[in-house]
């Protein structure tokens, strides 16, 4: 009788994150719970907790949100998958992915160092080690004393979108590993949908042992070298990622995972390694706007907008992103007006969003001039290069088994696009007012109280960190440093703001990015920075429209500051949620939760108001 051990240690991961967010609500939490279950007993109720989301709760739609993040997979199927991998163990010769039972196996990565020397390897235990924003991560311990990582996506997007993202992410990791020789986990197998032994989409990769680079990240440190010690290895990785010039805009896939029309062209030129020639192709883009919040669009509709695009059409990406957002908003509005949608929609808000994206549709092709003589090395900046959106010390592990070298994780949403349209990594990007010298840039700084000083110090350190990133880029790719120009950042901001779209009020930020171009438009045209010869601003805003927009934006920002957990869309870390509920600070009403403001503001015993 086969029995497998399932160990859930989600609380340990959650505890460390809560510590970062709020020491006041830190909880020690229980010890990891070990559960033994028969492999054949798929309905064993003891398994349920192992699959359920436990990292946090939502103030609204809590049950619905948690259900989307349930990652029930076949434990019996996992044992079958491992058995199939053993049969494909190789000498490392690079071959095309092997399709078997709905999974794709990368046999060149099934080696003694990843799976062990035993010929009869079995699963010893499975542990839940992380519940992330988009995925649940399990660690599989094998009888050979090797460990693997099983990453399962939450069902937050359409099945087609999840499938494309998995196919593209694995191909991207394979490219970074084999072509660029970069430190990334080796993928052993992947399943893009539920028609595999696990009955769940998955990526199975090697386990990297070590601490996150984030443990060394001190963004407000006075010691610049301490900050550089984290930024520099990420900048090194980034410079190699952008080193290849591709033939199209889109995303990377294995040859077998794209439609026949996308298999006609090489992903890039000059490949001399026969085993890599034709291994990867460029297919539809998996950038966020083509999948996030697009569940109500058909796969056919999405496919009309998500590329790939020709290398000589660098601005088509902006147009396509705009068009799919418009398609989605108009579809939501039509469903709401026909009373056919499952969600209660704010029709007036949808109409306002549509207006903003109609403005962006006009502006998109005019934002940047690919042939500008005022943009240094414009031709290089508009060439197709790989963009990894989640370069971050949270996604880098210091590998204790390989000379403490950083290994990079999480290549979801990676895409090939013009370098000029790439954002800086979020951990160094700063969009606020720049402060380069506290004493000279801030009048009266020396006489300020500590609280006021801290506000300016925050701005100073954020400015410094972004400057370090730009200096690193300049030293490695001086030909691309024009992206650091404040004018380039402003001109591309309407598009990059769409990439950060989180909820239905964020259209206000997109509109604000368009509005701010108005003041400088004539100068941008005169200097050939934008792709227009008409000095007249393309959008005619009435004073009434701008006043209403400013008022709405100010109100939205005030709501974010004053509304508890607005910045996390109502998500609360579970330890904090449990304690707030116990203390009566959170109260339940009809299955929803709200903050009892009067209790929060009430002074504790011994305090005065």
Curated annotation (Swiss-Prot):
Residues 1-24 form a transit peptide. SUPFAM superfamilies: Protein kinase-like (PK-like). It comes from the Eukaryota. Keywords: Mitochondrion, Transit peptide. InterPro entries: Aminoglycoside_PTrfase, Kinase-like_dom_sf, Mito_inheritance_9. It is found in: Mitochondrion. One of its GO terms (cellular component) is mitochondrion. Gene3D superfamilies: Phosphorylase Kinase, domain 1. Belongs to the AIM9 family. PANTHER family: ALTERED INHERITANCE OF MITOCHONDRIA PROTEIN 9, MITOCHONDRIAL. This is Altered inheritance of mitochondria protein 9, mitochondrial. It comes from Meyerozyma guilliermondii (strain ATCC 6260 / CBS 566 / DSM 6381 / JCM 1539 / NBRC 10279 / NRRL Y-324). The gene is AIM9.
């Amino acid at each position: 009788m086969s029995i497998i051990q399932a160990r859930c240690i989600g609380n340990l991961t959650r505890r460390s994150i809560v510590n970062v967010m709020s020491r006041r609500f830190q909880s020690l939490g229980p010890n990891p719970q070990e559960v033994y279950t028969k492999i054949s007993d798929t309905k064993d109720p003891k398994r349920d907790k192992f699959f359920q989301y436990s990292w946090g709760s939502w103030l609204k739609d809590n049950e619905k949100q948690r259900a989307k993040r349930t990652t029930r997979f076949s434990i019996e199927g996992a044992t079958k998958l491992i058995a199939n991998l053993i049969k494909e163990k190789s000498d490392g010769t690079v071959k095309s992915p092997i399709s078997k039972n709905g999974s794709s196996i990368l046999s060149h990565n099934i080696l003694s160092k990843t799976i062990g020397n035993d010929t009869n390897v079995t699963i010893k235990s499975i542990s839940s080690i992380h519940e992330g924003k988009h995925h649940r991560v399990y660690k599989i311990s094998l009888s050979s004393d090797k460990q693997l990582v099983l990453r399962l996506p939450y069902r937050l997007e359409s099945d087609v979108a999840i499938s494309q993202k998995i196919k593209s992410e694995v191909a991207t990791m394979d490219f970074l590993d084999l072509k660029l020789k970069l430190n990334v986990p080796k993928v052993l197998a992947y399943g893009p949908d539920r028609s595999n032994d696990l009955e769940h989409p998955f990526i199975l990769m090697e386990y990297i042992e070590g601490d996150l680079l984030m443990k060394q990240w001190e963004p407000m440190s006075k010691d610049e070298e301490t900050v550089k010690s984290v930024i520099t290895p990420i900048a090194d990785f980034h410079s190699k990622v952008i080193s290849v010039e591709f033939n199209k805009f889109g995303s990377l896939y294995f040859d077998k995972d794209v439609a026949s029309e996308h298999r006609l062209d090489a992903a890039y030129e000059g490949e001399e390694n026969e085993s890599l020639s034709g291994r990867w192709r460029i297919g539809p883009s998996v950038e966020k706007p083509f999948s996030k919040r697009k569940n109500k669009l058909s796969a056919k509709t999405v496919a009309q907008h998500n590329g790939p695009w020709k290398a000589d059409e660098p601005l088509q990406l902006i147009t396509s992103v705009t068009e799919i957002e418009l398609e989605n908003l108009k579809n939501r509005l039509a469903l709401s007006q026909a009373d056919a949608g499952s969600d209660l929609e704010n029709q007036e808000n949808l109409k306002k969003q549509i207006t903003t994206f109609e403005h962006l549709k006009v502006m998109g092709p005019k934002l940047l001039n690919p042939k500008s003589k005022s943009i240094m090395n414009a031709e290089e900046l508009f060439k197709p290069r790989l963009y990894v959106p989640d370069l971050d010390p949270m996604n880098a592990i210091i590998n204790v088994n390989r000379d403490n070298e950083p290994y990079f994780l999480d290549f979801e949403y990676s895409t090939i696009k013009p370098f000029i349209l790439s954002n800086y990594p979020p951990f160094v990007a700063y969009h606020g007012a720049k402060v380069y010298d506290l004493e000279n840039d801030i009048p009266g700084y020396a006489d300020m109280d500590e609280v006021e000083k801290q506000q300016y110090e925050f701005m100073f350190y954020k400015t410094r960190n972004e400057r370090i990133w730009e200096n690193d880029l300049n030293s490695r790719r001086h030909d691309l440093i024009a992206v650091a120009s404040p004018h380039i950042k402003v001109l591309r901001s309407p598009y990059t703001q769409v990439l950060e779209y989180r909820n239905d009020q964020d259209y206000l930020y997109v509109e604000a990015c368009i509005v701010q171009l108005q003041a400088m438009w004539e100068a941008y045209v005169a200097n050939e920075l934008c792709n227009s010869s008409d000095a007249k601003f393309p959008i005619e805003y009435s004073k009434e429209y701008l006043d209403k927009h400013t008022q709405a934006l100010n109100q939205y920002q005030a709501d974010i500051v004053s509304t508890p957990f607005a910045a996390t869309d109502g998500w609360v870390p579970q330890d904090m949620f449990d304690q707030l509920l116990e203390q009566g600070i959170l109260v339940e009403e009809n299955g929803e939760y709200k903050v009892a403001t009067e209790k929060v503001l009430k002074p504790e015993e011994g305090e005065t108001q």
